[in-house]
Every structure is written in structure tokens, then in C-alpha cells.
Curated annotation (Swiss-Prot):
Protein name: 2-isopropylmalate synthase
Naturally occurring in which organism (per UniProt): Synechococcus sp. (strain RCC307)
GO biological process: one example: L-leucine biosynthetic process
UniProt-listed SMART domains: LeuA_dimer
Stated family: Belongs to the alpha-IPM synthase/homocitrate synthase family. LeuA type 1 subfamily.
């Protein structure tokens, strides 16, 4: 049997696989903020990035390793292809962490071998132990993944896994890379590895899955029943295509259905010992933080953290919940840190009160960041009587979007109305302090603003998404605008909130432009799509 750590380990890859969601690019400060919150959530392993991809990714992993990788904190992991250059860069990046891991991978499915790697099975069986052994010479904790395991020949994969463990791999990860497996198939795959790999007792079995068929969480739970003890997942299930297995759904399934899963971990059915080490009260604020910083909204009916997860429309349901919440709720909302708290912050509230509430929401702001957020708070408080948690989150989100400010919005004025052509005049301030203005006409005020901004910056782009939603209720609510721009196949998102949605749209467009300009300077490799150089064997 595979090595059993005594509970289910949670491996969070929000900062690596999650960031590969279209438009979900994060800067260093945003990655660090998420990593710090993941540590408060008490995930076991943080996959902080792909260090070889770009200098920016290397710096992010190294900074997280230095600031979050404390002796009592999570393992800090980096991804590396099965090459010496990747593995050495990964080892250097995670070196400041007290607990380090290198996660290296190579495809094992015939379709990947033939069409992507152009390598034979014999070559793979030579590369894997060589590269795992090299990684193990640099760190004590090495994870090896059989990419596209769900479509691999099991007998060949058993050989690869055995060779990887023999070379020093401490965790063997089985990815359903394209989300193709069904729960029964995936469970059988894990059971087969547990039964047919002779040295599997020296390694923990891990699983990684995508949600292309909506089965990722179900597959993982079936894997746990068959011996998997590490789950690779992301906050809010973000990730490429249809996303990854959702951390909050997995953790709460194991929490709520503990008695069902206890037996599969060799425990008594009525054991109250948690199956994971997750601090569940941090789930909701972690979800909000990731949503705010990536700009990826959580769908209202999303399990656990969606806006409707604890809402009841039916009169019968409402009556039952009012009498006893257990009639229609299987989870106490407080378990995930969700409260009905409506804070009494207003224009007379001081900096300390704002800072304290932001910290409760998972935001650690100091210095200029706190000053900027407080200034925006006071500006909003002059226009709104009641400031809610969502308003505060929108303020912080807007601040985070402006960290790399190549352009700053200095002013915007629009003129529009029925039977009038919408006209906008915008003023931008560049990073060297120069101000420039331009006017433009459009089909509406937002289009006119975007035309004027594009005329000023002269950066080719295509507007592919514009959305606006109310942050809170009421006529004085802030409108939150999301804009996505596309250039050369890459998406860049911008977000802003204001009680004037046209101003919010202008700021969101500028934020997206800043990310686009920054992205042109730091274009990373994609770990699965980058060409694999010949390893030094």
C-alpha cells in the first residue's frame, strides 16, 4: 500500500495552475498576498509557480519561499519539466523555504509521447529516474507526475512510477490532465497503482485533475477511497479550460461526510479527527481574495462559496431554515467563515478601524498601500452612508490592480444623452509624470472612453469582455467593472469599482492596459506547452 501520512494532504496550485486561467495574471504582490492567506488556511503544500518560465515567476516563487516558507508553515513547491535547467532553477527558487519540494513531470500517454515529446517509451524510462535522482540530490522532497495519466497504458505507467520511486520520488502524482476520466475509472487507476507498483509504499499517491466534464471533485473523492492521500486543487476551482478540482468543495466534502470517509483512512466511523489540516473558517475569505485579485468572479450557484450557497428562495425552504437551519443546510455557514456581519464603517471611521476590518477579511496592508486604501475609503464614505465588506474588498482590489502603473487615469469627462453622440475626454498620466488628453466619440459613453484611451496609448488590443455588476444593494452602490483585452492570443483583465460606472470602466480599461504592457515585458513559458529540450543524460 502507498505511504499514508495519516490524513489527506491539500496541495494548492492556485498560484501555478490556477494562474493559467485566461486573463488571471497576477503580479508579485498579489501572489504573495494569496500565498500568505493560503498559509493561514493551513494548506500543506503551496505550488508557488514555474520558476524556469520567466524571471518574474522565479522571483515570485523565491519571495514566497522566503516570506511564507517558515518552519511551521507549508511546503513551498515549484514546478519543473524533466530537464536539468528547469530542476536547478526550481531548487534555487524554493531554497529559502524551510520545507522545499521540486515537482517534476513527464508525459506517459502514447498520444503525448508521439505528438508532443516525440520520444519512445524506452527514452521516458531513461529520462525519468535520471531527472528524479538529480532533483533528489538538490532537495529531500521530490514529486513526480505522470502527465496525462488518465490516458496512459497502466502497465507502462507502473514501470515509470516504480523507476521514479527507486530514484527518490517521495510523492507520485496521477493527473487527469484533460479531465477525461470518470470516477469509477479514476478510482480503479489509483487502486491499480497501489496494487501493482512494488515500491509504492515509499511514496504518497497524489491526484491532479481538470474539470472538463465536471467530474474533478468526484474523481478525487473516489481516489481517496482507493489510496490517494494528496489532492492537488485550486481555490474556486480556477484553472485552464473548465478549471481544476475545487479546494473548498473537496475539503468540505471530506469535512461534512467525515463518517463516510473515515473507514477508507483506517479510522473508526465515528472518529471526530479532521481528515485534512485545513482551517475551514478561512475558506470564504480565501475565496474572496483569490476572486478579487484574479478578477475571476465566483458564479452565484458555486458550491460552498457562491453567493447563493446559503440563500433560500422557496417559501417552504425559508420557513424551514428559520425554524432550524439544518432542515435545508448541511453546512453551518460559520464553518467556512461566512457571517452576516454588516460593519458600521462610515466617514467618521478611522484608519485603525479600517485596517482591522481589512485584516479580518484577509488583507494585510501597511504603509502606502494602507494610505491609498484609506484615502479611497474616505472618498467613498463621502458618497455612501454605509460601507460594507464588499465595498472594502472592491477598494483593495482596485489598489492591487494599480501596482504596476505605467498609466494612471488623471481625469474623465463624458457627454451623452438621447439623440446625442456620446463624447468622452480622458486624461492620462504616464509613469514619468507627463499628462496627455484626448477626446473621442463612441456608440455610448463607455465606448467613447475606450476609444479615447486607445487613441492615447496606441497599444494594439481587442476588447473581448465588458461587464458591470453592483457590489452591494442600494441606489448608492458601487458598480464594479471587469474588462478583458486580448493581444496575440493572451488575455489581460482589468477591474475597478466606483459609484460612477463610467469612471469605473475607464479605470478598469487603464488597469487592463497596464497589465498588457507589463505582460509584454514578462511573457512566461507554459509548462505543458513549452518545448522540452533534450536532457543531459
Amino acid at each position: 500500500m502507498a505511504r499514508d501520512p495519516g490524513r489527506v494532504l491539500i496541495f494548492d496550485t492556485t498560484l501555478r495552475d490556477g494562474e493559467q486561467s485566461p486573463g488571471a495574471s497576477l503580479n508579485l504582490d498579489e501572489k504573495l498576498a494569496i500565498a500568505q492567506q493560503l498559509a493561514r488556511l493551513r494548506v500543506d503544500i503551496i505550488e508557488a509557480g514555474f520558476p524556469f518560465a520567466s524571471p518574474g515567476d522565479f522571483d515570485a516563487v523565491q519571495t514566497i519561499a522566503r516570506q511564507v516558507g517558515r518552519p511551521d508553515g507549508p511546503v513551498i513547491c515549484g514546478l519543473a519539466r524533466a530537464t536539468r535547467g528547469d530542476i536547478k532553477a526550481c531548487a534555487d527558487a524554493v531554497a529559502p523555504a524551510a520545507n522545499q519540494r521540486i515537482h517534476t513531470f513527464l508525459a506517459t500517454s502514447d498520444i503525448h509521447l508521439e505528438h508532443k515529446l516525440r520520444k519512445s517509451r524506452a527514452e521516458v524510462l531513461q529520462i525519468v529516474p535520471e531527472m528524479v535522482a538529480y532533483a533528489r540530490s538538490l532537495v529531500d522532497d521530490v514529486e513526480f507526475s505522470c502527465e496525462d495519466a488518465g490516458r496512459s497504458d497502466p502497465e507502462f505507467m507502473y514501470q515509470v512510477i516504480e523507476a521514479a520511486i527507486e530514484a527518490g520520488a517521495t510523492t507520485i502524482n496521477i493527473p487527469d490532465t484533460v479531465g477525461y476520466s470518470t470516477p469509477a475509472e479514476f478510482g480503479a487507476l489509483i487502486a491499480g497503482i497501489d496494487a501493482h507498483v512494488p515500491n509504492i509504499g515509499q511514496a504518497v499517491i497524489s491526484v491532479h485533475g481538470h474539470n472538463d466534464l465536471g467530474l474533478a471533485v468526484a474523481n478525487f473523492l473516489e481516489a481517496v477511497k482507493n489510496g490517494a492521500r494528496q489532492l492537488e486543487c485550486t481555490i474556486n476551482g480556477i484553472g485552464e479550460r473548465a478549471g481544476n478540482a475545487s479546494l473548498e468543495e473537496l475539503v468540505m466534502a471530506l469535512h461534512v461526510r467525515r463518517s463516510y470517509f473515515n473507514g477508507y483512512l483506517g479510522r473508526a466511523e465515528d472518529s471526530s479527527e479532521p481528515l485534512t489540516g485545513i482551517q475551514t473558517e478561512e475558506i470564504y475569505k480565501t475565496s474572496r481574495l483569490v476572486s478579487n485579485l484574479t478578477g475571476m468572479a465566483v458564479q452565484p450557484n458555486k458550491a460552498i462559496v457562491g453567493a447563493n450557497a446559503f440563500a433560500h428562495e422557496s417559501g417552504i425552504h425559508q420557513d424551514g431554515v428559520l425554524k432550524n437551519r439544518l432542515t435545508y443546510e448541511i453546512i453551518d455557514a460559520r464553518t467556512i467563515g461566512l457571517t452576516d456581519n454588516r460593519i458600521s464603517l462610515g466617514k467618521l471611521s478611522g484608519r485603525s478601524a479600517v485596517r482591522a476590518r481589512l485584516e479580518e477579511l484577509g488583507y494585510q496592508l501597511d504603509g502606502d498601500d494602507l494610505n491609498d486604501a484609506f484615502a479611497r475609503f474616505k472618498e467613498l464614505a463621502d458618497r455612501k452612508r454605509e460601507i460594507t465588506d464588499r465595498d472594502l474588498e472592491a477598494i483593495v482590489r482596485q489598489n492591487a490592480q494599480q501596482i504596476e502603473a505605467y498609466y494612471q487615469l488623471a481625469g474623465v469627462q463624458v457627454s451623452c444623452g438621447r439623440d446625442l453622440r456620446a463624447t468622452a475626454t480622458v486624461t492620462l498620466r504616464t509613469s514619468d509624470g507627463e499628462e496627455c488628453s484626448q477626446a473621442a466619440i463612441g456608440t455610448g459613453p463607455v465606448d467613447a472612453v475606450c476609444q479615447a484611451l486607445n487613441g492615447l496609448v496606441q497599444v494594439p488590443n481587442e476588447l473581448v469582455e465588458f461587464s458591470v455588476k453592483s457590489v452591494t444593494e442600494g441606489i448608492d452602490a458601487m458598480g464594479e467593472v471587469t474588462i478583458r483585452l486580448r493581444q496575440d492570443g493572451r488575455l489581460y483583465s482589468g477591474h475597478a469599482a466606483d459609484t460612477d460606472v463610467v469612471v469605473a470602466a475607464a479605470q478598469a480599461f487603464v488597469n487592463a492596459l497596464n497589465r498588457l504592457v507589463s505582460g509584454q515585458k514578462h511573457s512566461p513559458l507554459h509548462p505543458q506547452r513549452a518545448p522540452l529540450p533534450a536532457p543531459a543524460l
